[in-house]
Structure formats: C-alpha cells, structure tokens
Amino acid sequence: MQKPLKLTFIADTHHYSKTLGTSGRQYELRSGSDQKCLAETGEIIDAAFEKIANSDTDFVLIAGDVSNDGELVSHIEFKKKLDRLAKKKKIYLITATHDWCCDENPRKFDGDTVSNDVETMPSFKLYPFYEEYTINDAIAKYETHLGTYSYVVQLSDKVRLLALNDDQNGKGRAGFKPKHFEWIDEQLKKA
C-alpha cells in the first residue's frame, strides 16, 4: 500500500518588495487600506517556507497571487525564496491576476509621492520565469490567450494535480473561456 501524500497549500502570498517603498504618507494610506502586511511579506513568507521545509510534507502547492501587483522586483525576490524551499521540497505553482498586474496599477512609494513607473512581469513571461515550478513536470497543459497555463501533474500513481489558471474569460473577468472548459473536462475524464 502506498503511503498517503502530504500536501501543503499556500495562496495569495502577495510578496511586496521593500525596494518599492515602505514609509511615507502615500505608503501608509495604501497599507492601511489593505489586510496585507505589505512591508512584512518577505519575512512572513520566509518564516512559512522555513517551517514547510522542515516539515514532512511531500509537495508544496502555491496558488497566486504570488506578487503584490506584478512588480518584476517582487517576482525576482519571490523566486529566490522558492529556490531555497525547492532544495528541500517539490513545489508546484500557479499564477493569478496580481502576478501580471491586471489592473495596470503597480505602485512605488516615496514619502508623499506615489508613482506607477514600476517594471512589471507581463503575463506571457510568467511561465518561462517560474517554469521549474509549473509546467516542467506537466503531463498536460493548456495555454490561455494571455500566455499563462493550466496544467496537470501526476503526483503519484493515483493522484493528479489539476492546476487551473482562471485569469480571464475573454470578457474582462476572471474565469475560463469555453475551450479551456473543454480542456478541463477532458483532463477530469482522463483522471
């Protein structure tokens, strides 16, 4: 008999790089209007990943939003954290709308000034960037119109992970296009 798989699931880390600013009136207004601990996300993620690395979990499943608003610097920092965790655990990741800044409003704070001149990660670059944690082990994958993916991974003889990306339904809202639903249905039948 196969031992049961142990999975750890994390979602919505919203990693925010401190290089984007963590003080000043504009930052305080932004931070105070949100339940996220923006300035502390790095330390919170590090503590969680350390605990997971030292646990007996077999796989780590991470669902986006992994970055706060798609900021390239936040993705680069988050990937370094993933790389450290990956030395001890197998990771599977799926991105979401904040990972490519769907609202086109990335922000940087400097005192009383807020600016939007922040380099972001385009949706079609997310999967090459996170490839080793996404589609590398996929037995099936579906590329969306945004260049993001849903994918299937065989975790064991009897367990498949269906990682679904519902970034847009083609009507400006989160969801799936009809062809994507067909692919999902096909994967469920194969499982």
Language model: regions and residue ranges:
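Flexible, charged surface loops at secondary-structure boundaries
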Residues: 52-56, 155, 191
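N-terminal active-site segment of His-dependent metallophosphoesterases
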Residues: 1-72
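Extended active-site neighborhood of metal-dependent phosphoesterases/phosphodiesterases
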Residues: 72, 77-189
